[in-house]
Amino acid sequence: GNSRVHNDDCEAFVYWFIEQAKAHGCETCIFLGDWHHHRASTNVSTMNYTVSNMERLGKAFEKVYVIMGNHDLFYRDKREINSMEFIRNIPNIHIVNDWIVEDDVAIIPWIVGDEWKKIEKMTQKYVFGHFELPYFKMNAMVEMPDVGGIKTEHFANCGMVFTGHFHKRQQMKNVTYMGN
C-alpha cells in the first residue's frame, strides 16, 4: 500500500533481508515482482521509500533484478508502462521488463499474450518469474482456476522455478511460490 506503516514494515524487511543474504554469501538479489501494490496510485512518499530501498539493495548486491509483476504494470495485458522506471539508473539495479535467458537461468516478467507458449521449450536449471498458475492458492482459501493458459506442467523441462504473484508460500512439483 501507500501507508507509512506499510512502507516502514517493508523497509525493515529490506534491512533484515540484506543482513540474511550477506550472512549466506549472496551476491545477487532477484525480486519476484509487485514492488508496488497500487498500479494507478503510487504516492510520492512510497516512491521515496522505493528509491531509498532500491539504493540500499543496489549497494548491498552486485546485481539486483527487479521483475515487473502485474501490480507494477499500468496495464495488465502489456508491459509498456511500469511504476518502476524511475529507479532504472540506480547502480546495480536491473528492471526486468523483458525476458532474460542466459545459460542455466531465466528471469521472466509478468507474462502477456501468448508468451507462455515459449516456456515448454525452456530447459533452464533456474527460472524466476511472476506467474499466475492454476491450482495454486491465491490466498488462504481460494484456488486459482485453470483459464487455459500457462500451467505448472509447462515447466517440466526446467529445474527449479521460483515465482511471485500469489501471497501464500506453496510448492507443487518444481514450482515454488515464495509468498510474502
Name what the model sees in each region.
Residues W99-E153:
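Binuclear metal-dependent hydrolase catalytic cores centered on His/Asp/Glu-rich metal-binding motifs
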Residues H36, D72, I111-G113, E132-P134, ...:
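Short, solvent-exposed loop/turn segments at secondary-structure junctions
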Residues V44-M47, R79-S83, E120-K121, A140-M144, ...:
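Short, glycine/charged-enriched secondary-structure capping and boundary segments
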Residues L133, N139-N180:
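Conserved beta-sheet core of the metallophosphoesterase superfamily
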Residues I30, Y65, V96, A106, ...:
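Hydrophobic/aromatic beta-strand patches that form the interior of the parallel beta-sheet core
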Residues N2-I100, H154-C158:
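Core catalytic region of metal-dependent phosphoesterases/phosphodiesterases
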Residues V14-W16, K22, G113-E115, E120, ...:
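A structural signal for the main folded, soluble domain(s) of proteins
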Residues G33-D34, G69-N70, H130, G164-H165, ...:
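Active-site glycine-centered loops adjacent to acidic/histidine catalytic or metal-binding residues
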